[in-house]
Amino acid sequence: MAAEPPALRLRPPGSTGDSPPVPRLLGGCVPLSHQVAGHMYGKDKVGILQHPDGTVLKQLQPPPRGPRELEFYTMVYAADCADAVLLELRKHLPKYYGVWSPPTAPNDVYLKLEDVTHKFNKPCIMDVKIGRKSYDPFASSEKIQQQVSKYPLMEEIGFLVLGMRVYHLHSDSYETQNQHYGRGLTKETLKEGVSKFFHNGFCLRKDAIAASIQKVEKILQWFENQKQLNFYASSLLFVYEGSSQPATTKANDRTLAGRFLSKGPLTDADGLECNNNFHLFGAPPNGMSVGKSLSKAYSRHRKLYAKKHQSQTSLKVETLEQDNGWRSMSQEHLNGNVLAQLEKVFYHLPAGRPEIPEAEVRMIDFAHVFPSNTVDEGYVYGLKHLIAVLRSILDS
């Protein structure tokens, strides 16, 4: 079993100091604020909880599902595990910290897991069920019929979006979609439906798509090289950073935005380089609208970025889609509080970083994992189709 979890932030990812108080439950735990799928707190199930130390608590399901998932985590994270396949699998799972029970209810058992979102400021989260079948080999005919009726296209598509939570820059808020959104996607609307997860209200986050593809491809590689386990009704949890700047840089950005709009213009010679090499030149010349001035500054920033990184062959973070998002923003969204809008522009810009952004893709939900001696063709099929859809979005 893994060591004790590190001390994590007290507030849920994406929350603010003005967030309403969260009800405290067993042992000081609170409902997981950023859960996008599964049993939710406040309904017929207790849902996923967050422990005061920052870990996630998943209540053990009734037999045989709960004991089966516990056995899976215990096997993979056994201290004496020497199986290369399982050791490699750990890289794609949330860290497991054993089981936990509240002092007042010792018979209630919870899996204690890493909160994959803890390092993100504004985490965008999507839960995608993988595989051509969402029922296991021992399911009854009634169970099979029930699962097939929920999403008849599962066999053909190979995955199902169970929920998503996307941070929108322009409103500083989250948009959420539940399982009904995913079940409503057809072969014709699947690409657009998945791309919604990567759109921040200004542009399509192709950098996050590319980073996610890399993670999924590593999981696919693991599945293609193992014949020990088959997974049913299991999911991938996607997470990427919705805010392009850490919270600690916002004060600096506000100062920069203020100087841009101040009466004392910055000359070309006074070009600023702040935070992650974002270049800003000059205040709006007399007679030039703020929108046009911003477009000009952005154009110069892009030219400098292209010149600086033209020899690099890494993935291009800035795209035509982002250009269009900029033009739309500069023409339509600069009414009212110009300073506030300008700050959002700074967060939106890629800031000249050539590296791949922070993103996570982890496997979750293991109540239907079974020993096998063959490649898990259903899961592999789903992964390959998901990668194909993501690549299609990236290349569009």
Curated annotation (Swiss-Prot):
Residue ranges annotated as motif Nuclear localization signal? 300-310
Cellular component, GO annotation: nucleus
Span list, region Disordered: 1-22
Q: Which residues bind ATP?
A: 58, 114-116, 127, 365
Gene Ontology BP term (one): neural tube formation
Binding of substrate, residues:
65, 129, 143-150, 179
Cofactor(s) named in the record: Mg(2+)
| N-acetylalanine PTM sites in chain numbering | 2
In what ranges is there compositional bias, type Low complexity? 1-13
Keywords of this entry: Acetylation, ATP-binding, Kinase, Lipid metabolism, Magnesium, Metal-binding, Nucleotide-binding, Nucleus, Phospholipid metabolism, Phosphoprotein, Transferase
Question: Under which pathway is this protein filed?
Answer: Phospholipid metabolism; phosphatidylinositol metabolism
Top EC category:
transferase
Catalytic activity field = 1D-myo-inositol 1,4,5-trisphosphate + 2 ATP = 1D-myo-inositol 1,3,4,5,6-pentakisphosphate + 2 ADP + 2 H(+); 1D-myo-inositol 1,3,4,6-tetrakisphosphate + ATP = 1D-myo-inositol 1,3,4,5,6-pentakisphosphate + ADP + H(+); 1-octadecanoyl-2-(5Z,8Z,11Z,14Z)-eicosatetraenoyl-sn-glycero-3-phospho-1D-myo-inositol 4,5-bisphosphate + ATP = 1-octadecanoyl-2-(5Z,8Z,11Z,14Z-eicosatetraenoyl)-sn-glycero-3-phospho-(1D-myo-inositol 3,4,5-triphosphate) + ADP + H(+); a 1,2-diacyl-sn-glycero-3-phospho-(1D-myo-inositol-4,5-bisphosphate) + ATP = a 1,2-diacyl-sn-glycero-3-phospho-(1D-myo-inositol-3,4,5-trisphosphate) + ADP + H(+)
According to the UniProt record, list the residues that bear Phosphoserine.
Answer: 19
Compartment(s):
Nucleus
The free-text cofactor remark is: Binds two Mg(2+), but the interaction with the protein is mostly indirect.
Q: Which GO terms describe its molecular function?
A: 1-phosphatidylinositol-4,5-bisphosphate 3-kinase activity; ATP binding; inositol-1,3,4,5-tetrakisphosphate 6-kinase activity; inositol-1,3,4,6-tetrakisphosphate 5-kinase activity; inositol-1,4,5,6-tetrakisphosphate 3-kinase activity; inositol-1,4,5-trisphosphate 3-kinase activity; inositol-1,4,5-trisphosphate 6-kinase activity; metal ion binding
* Enzyme Commission numbers on file: 2.7.1.140, 2.7.1.151, 2.7.1.153
Family label: Belongs to the inositol phosphokinase (IPK) family.
Annotated PANTHER family: INOSITOL POLYPHOSPHATE KINASE, INOSITOL POLYPHOSPHATE MULTIKINASE
Q: What does this protein do?
A: Inositol phosphate kinase with a broad substrate specificity. Phosphorylates inositol 1,4,5-trisphosphate (Ins(1,4,5)P3) first to inositol 1,3,4,5-tetrakisphosphate and then to inositol 1,3,4,5,6-pentakisphosphate (Ins(1,3,4,5,6)P5). Phosphorylates inositol 1,3,4,6-tetrakisphosphate (Ins(1,3,4,6)P4). Phosphorylates inositol 1,4,5,6-tetrakisphosphate (Ins(1,4,5,6)P4). Phosphorylates glycero-3-phospho-1D-myo-inositol 4,5-bisphosphate to glycero-3-phospho-1D-myo-inositol 3,4,5-trisphosphate.
Name-wise, this protein is Inositol polyphosphate multikinase
Which gene is annotated as encoding this protein in its UniProt record?
Ipmk
